[in-house]
């Protein structure tokens, strides 16, 4: 796919962007052929200008993601006229000493985005409470929540520990958070799990199954079994009691789809490399 260092709204840059989107959709469709469900392509623009999101929307793309809550809120304001656009927040609001008040204010501002479809990076009960309490009263549907799982074990990556067995999961932060959302957060909906695979697995994913994705699938299976065993949870999680998986980015989204992912997140492959702020 083509790439460029200029993000100015020129006819040439627009044509390049839309060519990237078209090529991504071709690969997306090919990798999805064996799936029994219809997956979602989330276009992640990161630091790119709002005109690029609008251009992709005009070509039929509807789901867009941002790593930065500030970028998402700002772009949502600029693109408020795009009524069918669905925003996905896939980043992490890191906690810094003395900045907790500001962080909570940003979380509340994020929930004010009327077409915010999902937060794919939840990792704590504390944050679940903040989001649940901040949801506007006029929001018609609960906000979808995907719990981020660290499947690679890399310390630099966010996410909760994966689980292999029900015995292991019973006291795990991951299962406790899932149950907490279902039981105590009526304005949130526990929809699924998200992971960011390691570079090593991404590079090898064309030759063999991506082990990070296999780990997430196993974790999904364990959680589904435990949630289904509780009659009080019936109909209160997932999509028809099936947890959605968000796994796969530019370098490995095709492997993610082959592994059964419901959502893939493609940034560089569509928009080009991010700009340094």
Q: What are the functions of these language-model segments?
A:
Residues 2-251, 257-259, 271-273:
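Conserved alpha/beta-domain cores
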Residues 261-277:
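Gly/Pro- and small hydrophobic-enriched strand-loop and loop-to-helix capping segments
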